[in-house]
Structures are given as structure tokens and as C-alpha cells.
From Swiss-Prot:
Upper lineage: Eukaryota, Fungi, Dikarya, Ascomycota, Saccharomycotina
Record: transit peptide: 1-21
Coiled-coil positions: none
Organism: Saccharomyces cerevisiae (strain ATCC 204508 / S288c) (Baker's yeast)
One Gene Ontology MF term: dihydrolipoyl dehydrogenase (NADH) activity
Gene3D superfamilies referenced in this protein's UniProt entry, alphabetically: 3.30.390.30, FAD/NAD(P)-binding domain
Protein family membership: Belongs to the class-I pyridine nucleotide-disulfide oxidoreductase family.
Residues the entry annotates as binding NAD(+): 211-218, 234, 268, 305
Cofactor note: Binds 1 FAD per subunit.
Quaternary structure and partners: LPD1 is a homodimer. Eukaryotic pyruvate dehydrogenase (PDH) complexes are organized as a core consisting of the oligomeric dihydrolipoamide acetyl-transferase (E2), around which are arranged multiple copies of pyruvate dehydrogenase (E1), dihydrolipoamide dehydrogenase (E3) and protein X (E3BP) bound by non-covalent bonds. Component of the 2-oxoglutarate dehydrogenase complex (OGDC), also called alpha-ketoglutarate dehydrogenase (KGDH) complex.
The protein's name in its UniProt record: Dihydrolipoyl dehydrogenase, mitochondrial
Active site positions: 478
Length: 499
């Protein structure tokens, strides 16, 4: 009794004593990580009858994609495009605007944040609906069959005590983090990652971006529309490393017309803040001529990719294998060295894409239930939500040439598409690659309006081994942008009608 009274009189002692307590729970499946791979796996596991739990330390479900990636960036891209259209196209569309059109940065950011909040809350509701136990806390391996969940300081709703979860099956889905650039310190104010770029409090006069991949080009598009002078520095000789070469060149042409400046085959030597001038000073070097150039920008965005995130997981504690790139090593059934510990999403092999992660989450759980699961890694679409949008799936021309595969090309421009004409949005084309002998579709590449939506038809065709004629003989509604996809397939095996 005296011991209890003394603890109550000493909050610090009481707090430290409470933290030593543990609560033991048992589950059939525990997923560490609540991003696209993790939360989808958790819901699917519960639907298949497993007693399921998900551990997430962010405090909000959805991972990088929903909180500081795909979703907030699309809100900024959409709203900045509307702003740009009103500024540059209203008059030609017969819309007279009286007064200035301005960006209210606070409300611009609020619209983004509202979308994120609604979607993260929606996932929590799905957890409740499917009876998934949700632990807000740090999850780490106690041993190969136990997960320790510890409180996260300052996180609302975090577990109050350590939990030890006794688990039959574990799925690791801890995701990825921003890849740092050697010698450049990110402060998320003047030198920012993609996370900081999503939440700038004012529009910079000049924005320099290190990296000409999807993240950099999307953020460059946003701020270029809002008035920033955007410079993209890319080490490779072309932007969009995984794009078809022809499409990459067309994309650069369209973005350059919108005001983005490109320095290709260029490396960054250094970058540092100069607070006296309120700028970041950047030194770059042309890799062909070795000529150096000094750049200045109010904001520098470092967008050189992402890397697997396993900090605090305790992978080394149980001997999980990690490769040179920091990825957890698995077999073709997502198994680590322990068959009951599976790994999915960005933390392991394959493209770091939310939809790929979701597919793996479902497949891994189905393997637990039935011994079978399916992800077709040759049919994972990619989309860049610039304007025009860029989307692709399957093989590029470069890949087909390297593999020695004979192929034919079918192309159709949006300038010849009736819906694109009515929308006054005609930049770009659809490009189809087919096997010369069988005429099966090998790859599809779209640059143009709504490319991200249209690419789904290409994915379906690839998944079921369709030929170009199979697609061309499907009746497509008129007038729609999807008719351009039909016509490109017609052009691949015969001739397009409207071009």
C-alpha cells in the first residue's frame, strides 16, 4: 500500500513503472505497417477469417502514399491545373473573368489536407468494419514469433503500455523513405524532400529540382503553374528513367513549353543555404563538358528516389536478410528466411508503387489462406500526373530491342480524337507495341489527357494476352478519349480510321 501511495505522489516514477508493464495478445496475422501494402493486407486477412492486427507508428493509416505522397500531390496537381486553366484558357473557352485570379496558399493547402484526412479516416472505418485490431505504436520483432508494440511519444491514441503480440503469421510492410543526397542536408524549409514540397507556405520565385523522375516532374508542374521558375537537374541524358524513349522526349517538350527548364546529363556538386540572401546556392556540372554553373533558388527540392525503411524493425535481431540496397530479401512467395514471415511493398523488391504494394498485400494473404497468390510484375502500370498525363504498362521500345523481339508500332494522336478536340486538350498520342508475328500487345504508352485512366484498358489486354485486333474490335463509346486507344491498336495491325 505504501509503495502505491509513493508512486502516486511521484508522477515520474509512476510513469516509468507503467512503461515496464506489458500486455500480451495473440493474433493469427499481424501486419507491421499501415501503408497501401499493409492496410490492404490487413483488411483482406480479416475478410478471409484471420484474427488480424495492424501496427502503425505514424498514427495515420495510408502510409507515404496517402499522407505525404500520391494523394496530397494529386490534390495539388489538380487544383494548380484548374488555376492555370483559368489564367491561360478561360477567354478562349468563352469564360470572361472579372478581377484577379489568385492562389490562396492557406486554402490551397487546406483542400489537400482535407482530402488526406477524409481518406485516412476512411481506412480506420474499414478496419472497424472488418474487425482489424489497430495498434498505434512502434512495431518490432521480439523474436521470430512475437512482435513488441511500444508507445510513440506525443502521438495521440498511441498504445499506453508495451504490447507483446504472439503471432502465427507476420507480414512486414514498413514501406520506404526519401533517399538523401550526399552532402545536402534537408531542412524541409529551403531544402526540401517531396514531403516538404507538398506543404510550402508560399510559392517560391525559383524552384530547382534535383531529379527528373515522376516525383520531381509532378512537383515541378505544380509550382510552375503557380508562377515559379522551375529548373530540373537530371544526371541522366533524359527525364523519366523508366519511360519509353520517344514518350520521354515528347514529355520533356510539353513540359518545356509550360516553362520548365531542363539541365540533363548534369550532376549536382553542392547545395547550401544562404540565409542572408534567402536563397539556396547550387553548383552543378555538365557531365559531358565538365563545365560548372552556379544556380540560385528560393527552394531546392531533392527528388532522387526512395529507399526501403526498416529502422526500428529489429530485422537484424532475428536474422532477416537485407541486400545491398537495403531491401528485405524474399523468395517468389514473399517469404523471408522464415516461411511465416512475409514481406511486401516498398521494403522489398520491385517498383515502389502503391498499386504494386496493394497487389502484393492481397497475394501474400491469399498465400497464407490457400497457398496461392498472383502478382504479374510484367503488368504493373506507371502514371505521371503532369499535364498532359503520361502512363505506360508493359515493354518499352528500348526493352524490346534489347531482348531482340520483332515488334510493330501503332500510334494515334489525340489531335485526331473528337473528345480531345471538344475539350481543347489535344497534346500527345497513344503508342502500342505488338509482337510482329502474333500481334499480341507487348506494351502501351500514352501521353495525353486522362492517360492514367486509359492505361487500365491496356493492363487488362496485357493480362489476358489480347492482340491489337482483339482491342480494336471492341466497340468503344463515342465521343471518348478511349477511342484513341482503339485507333492506335488498329494502326498496329492494320490502319487507323481517323488518321
Amino acid at each position: 500500500m505504501l509503495r502505491i501511495r509513493s508512486l502516486l505522489n511521484n508522477k515520474r516514477a509512476f510513469s516509468s513503472t507503467v512503461r515496464t508493464l506489458t500486455i500480451n495478445k495473440s493474433h493469427d496475422v499481424v501486419i507491421i505497417g499501415g501503408g497501401p501494402a499493409g492496410y490492404v493486407a490487413a483488411i483482406k486477412a480479416a475478410q478471409l477469417g484471420f484474427n488480424t492486427a495492424c501496427v502503425e507508428k505514424r498514427g495515420k493509416l495510408g502510409g507515404t502514399c496517402l499522407n505525404v505522397g500520391c494523394i496530397p500531390s494529386k490534390a495539388l496537381l489538380n487544383n494548380s491545373h484548374l488555376f492555370h486553366q483559368m489564367h491561360t484558357e478561360a477567354q478562349k473557352r468563352g469564360i470572361d473573368v472579372n478581377g484577379d485570379i489568385k492562389i490562396n496558399v492557406a486554402n490551397f493547402q487546406k483542400a489537400k489536407d482535407d482530402a488526406v484526412k477524409q481518406l485516412t479516416g476512411g481506412i480506420e472505418l474499414l478496419f472497424k468494419k472488418n474487425k482489424v485490431t489497430y495498434y498505434k505504436g512502434n512495431g518490432s520483432f521480439e523474436d521470430e514469433t512475437k512482435i513488441r508494440v511500444t508507445p510513440v511519444d506525443g502521438l495521440e491514441g498511441t498504445v499506453k503500455e508495451d504490447h507483446i503480440l504472439d503471432v502465427k503469421n507476420i507480414i512486414v510492410a514498413t514501406g520506404s523513405e526519401v533517399t538523401p543526397f550526399p552532402g545536402i542536408e534537408i531542412d524541409e524549409e529551403k531544402i526540401v524532400s517531396s514531403t516538404g514540397a507538398l506543404s510550402l507556405k508560399e510559392i517560391p520565385k525559383r524552384l530547382t529540382i534535383i531529379g527528373g523522375g515522376i516525383i520531381g516532374l509532378e512537383m515541378g508542374s505544380v509550382y510552375s503553374r503557380l508562377g515559379s521558375k522551375v529548373t530540373v537537374v537530371e544526371f541522366q541524358p533524359q527525364i523519366g528513367a523508366s519511360m519509353d524513349g520517344e514518350v520521354a522526349k515528347a514529355t520533356q517538350k510539353f513540359l518545356k513549353k509550360q516553362g520548365l527548364d531542363f539541365k540533363l546529363s548534369t550532376k549536382v556538386i553542392s547545395a547550401k543555404r544562404n540565409d542572408d540572401k534567402n536563397v539556396v546556392e547550387i553548383v552543378v556540372e555538365d557531365t559531358k563538358t565538365n563545365k560548372q554553373e552556379n544556380l540560385e533558388a528560393e527552394v531546392l527540392l531533392v527528388a532522387v528516389g526512395r529507399r526501403p525503411y526498416i529502422a526500428g524493425l529489429g530485422a537484424e535481431k532475428i536474422g532477416l536478410e537485407v541486400d545491398k540496397r537495403g531491401r528485405l530479401v524474399i523468395d517468389d512467395q514473399f517469404n523471408s528466411k522464415f516461411p511465416h514471415i512475409k514481406v511486401v511493398g516498398d521494403v522489398t523488391f520491385g517498383p515502389m508503387l502503391a498499386h504494386k504494394a496493394e497487389e502484393e498485400g492481397i497475394a501474400a494473404v491469399e498465400m497464407l489462406k490457400t497457398g496461392h497468390g498472383h502478382v504479374n510484375y510484367n503488368n504493373i502500370p506507371s502514371v505521371m500526373y503532369s499535364h498532359p498525363e503520361v502512363a505506360w504498362v508493359g515493354k518499352t521500345e528500348e526493352q524490346l530491342k534489347e531482348a531482340g523481339i520483332d515488334y510493330k508500332i501503332g500510334k494515334f494522336p489525340f489531335a485526331a480524337n473528337s473528345r480531345a478536340k471538344t475539350n481543347q486538350d489535344t497534346e500527345g498520342f497513344v503508342k502500342i507495341l505488338i509482337d510482329s508475328k502474333t500481334e499480341r500487345i507487348l506494351g502501351a504508352h500514352i501521353i495525353g489527357p486522362n492517360a492514367g485512366e486509359m492505361i487500365a484498358e491496356a493492363g487488362l489486354a496485357l493480362e489476358y494476352g489480347a492482340s491489337a485486333e482483339d482491342v480494336a474490335r471492341v466497340c468503344h463509346a463515342h465521343p471518348t478519349l478511349s477511342e484513341a486507344f482503339k485507333e492506335a491498336n488498329m494502326a498496329a495491325y492494320d490502319k487507323a480510321i481517323h488518321c
